[in-house]
């Protein structure tokens, strides 16, 4: 299999030399980190032009990650979407269970090139942490993962996985005790230990070069999916759909389709209990431009410019910022961003589980809910591509509590009977 990683960007889509996508991006960091961030940028530029780097990354993607990931049509699920055809890009089938391994392997190789011996990372749902711990075990690197205390509780399985892989997991007890605060602590660690440490940033946010670099490592998703759907459906999709927190899985899918003007790029943000309640993390829906974690982008903030606390049932989407390229795509009208509530996402999770035998991550379920609505808009001639960014093993405790699956057997069976009747009725 040839490399899908360093294909030249379509003209005009790379950031400026200063890392800007239009008005968004840049590098807003303390002086103590300037040299380290500049080193990452220089080494990444060298790696992009080094065939040996691309070959090593490609070998890992194929023989370790298991790429290319499958493209799966889900006709029974699609019956609930107005009959539009729906295909899932199965990033959930990657080693470690999500898209996160794509970026992690690339940055782990870069860490080796820089001669660093220690890696730190933030994680929300735990998938980036698990992928980072996996790569560190593979390459013999010391690993510390920062995770909000609330997220360590709702993602206890992934905490155990990280520790099994040899990582130190630090529960962050400051602020909202979620992803934003984990990133803050990771930056503090990097300042204190910059000589031997690389911060393996997990999304397309942060200071330049991280938004472009993380995107580049994930763009294989869209490159593969574009080729696969042309082979399977004979044409490009009407829409490419992905969940959006920081935005890495979404930009990985979208990027290959940006030049295809007939393909709508639809990002599904977490509306939580409803955007109108204030309890959400729908940054592009309700945010304003500001500075967060080293770059300028849309952020959730109050009238005084202070970052507000986000909320989502999904730990991986519970973030008050967004990658700067998404902000640019929103402003120029190339990207569409919709807000999906907790309830809509959870119903989509259960529907996919019971119609197709695939249990998605709660993050991915936001995209599935968006696809259901989009399918009803497009009708039976519609063709939708959804990035299934991760599997739902990590979310089973949350799902079980949400749906009452820990209740008595009789209650569970009654719930299942009700669902089957609803599904059969909708399909008629």
Swiss-Prot record:
EC number: 4.2.1.20
InterPro entries hit by this protein: Trp_synth_b_CS (IPR006653), Trp_synth_beta (IPR006654), Trp_synth_beta/beta-like (IPR023026), TrpB-like_PALP (IPR001926), TrpB-like_PALP_sf (IPR036052)
Protein's pathway: Amino-acid biosynthesis; L-tryptophan biosynthesis; L-tryptophan from chorismate: step 5/5
Domain of life: Bacteria
N6-(pyridoxal phosphate)lysine sites (modified residues): 100
Reaction catalyzed: (1S,2R)-1-C-(indol-3-yl)glycerol 3-phosphate + L-serine = D-glyceraldehyde 3-phosphate + L-tryptophan + H2O
Enzyme class: lyase
Oligomeric and partner information: Tetramer of two alpha and two beta chains.
Function as written in the Swiss-Prot or TrEMBL entry: The beta subunit is responsible for the synthesis of L-tryptophan from indole and L-serine.
Listed name of the protein: Tryptophan synthase beta chain
Originating gene: trpB
């Amino acid at each position: 299999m040839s490399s899908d990683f360093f294909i030249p960007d379509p003209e005009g889509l790379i950031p400026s030399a200063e890392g800007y996508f239009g008005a968004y991006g840049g590098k807003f960091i303390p002086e103590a980190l300037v040299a380290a961030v500049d080193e990452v940028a220089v080494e990444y530029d060298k790696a992009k032009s080094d065939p040996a780097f691309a070959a090593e990354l490609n070998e890992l993607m194929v023989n370790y990650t298991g790429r290319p990931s499958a493209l799966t049509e889900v006709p029974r699920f699609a019956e609930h979407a107005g009959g539009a055809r729906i295909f899932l890009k199965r990033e959930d089938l990657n080693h470690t269970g999500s898209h996160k391994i794509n970026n992690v392997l690339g940055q782990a190789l870069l860490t080796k090139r820089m001669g660093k011996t220690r890696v730190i990372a933030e994680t929300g749902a735990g998938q980036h942490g698990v992928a980072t711990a996996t790569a560190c075990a593979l390459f013999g690197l010391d690993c510390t993962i920062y995770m909000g205390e609330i997220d360590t509780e709702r993602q206890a399985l992934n905490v155990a996985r990280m520790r099994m892989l040899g990582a130190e997991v630090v529960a962050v007890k400051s602020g909202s005790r979620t992803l934003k605060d984990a990133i803050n602590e990771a930056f503090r660690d990097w300042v204190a230990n910059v000589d031997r440490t690389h911060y393996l940033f997990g999304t397309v946010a942060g200071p330049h070069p991280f938004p472009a670099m993380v995107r580049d490592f994930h763009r294989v998703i869209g490159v593969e999916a574009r080729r696969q759907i042309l082979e399977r459906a004979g044409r490009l999709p009407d829409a490419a759909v992905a969940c959006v927190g920081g935005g890495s899985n979404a930009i990985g899918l979208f990027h290959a389709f940006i030049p295809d003007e007939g393909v709508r790029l639809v990002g599904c943000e977490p509306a939580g209990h409803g955007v109108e309640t204030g309890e959400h993390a729908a940054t592009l829906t309700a945010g304003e431009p500001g500075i967060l974690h080293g770059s300028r982008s849309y952020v959730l903030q109050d009238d005084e410019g202070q970052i507000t606390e986000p909320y989502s049932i999904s730990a991986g989407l519970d973030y008050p910022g967004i990658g700067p390229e998404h902000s640019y795509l929103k402003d120029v009208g190339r990207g569409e961003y919709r807000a999906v509530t907790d309830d809509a996402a959870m119903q989509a999770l259960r529907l996919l589980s019971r119609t197709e035998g695939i249990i998605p991550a709660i993050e991915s379920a936001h995209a599935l809910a968006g696809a259901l609505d989009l399918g009803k808009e497009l009708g039976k001639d519609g063709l939708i591509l959804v990035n299934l960014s991760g599997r739902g093993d990590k979310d089973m405790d949350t799902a079980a509590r949400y749906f009452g699956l820990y209740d008595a057997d009789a209650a569970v069976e009654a719930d299942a009977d009700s669902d089957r009747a609803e599904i059969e009725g909708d399909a008629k």
